[in-house]
Regions:
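Small-residue-biased structural context
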Residues: 1-162
Length: 162
């Protein structure tokens, strides 16, 4: 699977988890907490592989603004995750923060799958996208062996470098 297919698959997986969460809203605190943790783990690992491998592969003069915006969006998402990690699903504000998290992720996905995917197709060959996909998947799988959500609070001071 090439890098773009992998990233899109991860986006779709998180979108599916958000949909499950919406159906549980205001019910089943333990299940909602578990879904949040699954979402946070996936988003934490996903942001890490994008910042460490995908975005650097796209760094050119004409992509710099889009990449800066992407890492700022990641920072905003990480800050919400850090806030949610300090809360319980039973807290009054939990569902509202989850909704904001979902909206920010959806916005980021829309821009990334548009502007950055277009840039990737222009800048990287098929072989480069394939190789990058392998690297992204291996790193993601390694991160997911742990609980990557727990690394997120340490990444909330400033946006990742590009």
């Amino acid at each position: 699977m090439n890098a773009l297919e992998l990233i899109k698959q991860q986006h779709e997986e998180v979108a599916g988890l958000f949909k499950k969460y919406e159906k549980l809203a205001e019910h089943a605190d333990a299940e909602r907490q578990e879904l949040f943790e699954q979402i946070a783990d996936r988003l934490g690992a996903h942001a890490k592989i994008e910042e460490d491998y995908f975005y650097p592969a796209l760094k050119k003069e004409d992509t710099e603004d889009d990449l800066r915006e992407a890492v700022e969006e990641h920072l905003s998402v990480k800050r919400l995750i850090a806030d949610l990690l300090e809360m319980d699903a039973s807290d009054e504000e939990f569902d509202a923060k989850m909704k904001v998290l979902q909206e920010q992720v959806e916005h980021h996905v829309e821009e990334e799958e548009g502007d950055l995917f277009k840039a990737a197709r222009k800048l990287l060959s098929k072989d480069q996208l394939d190789d990058l996909g392998i690297q992204l998947e291996e790193e993601y799988d390694t991160l997911m062996e742990g609980e990557p959500r727990n690394d997120v609070p340490a990444e909330t001071e400033h946006a990742a470098p590009i």
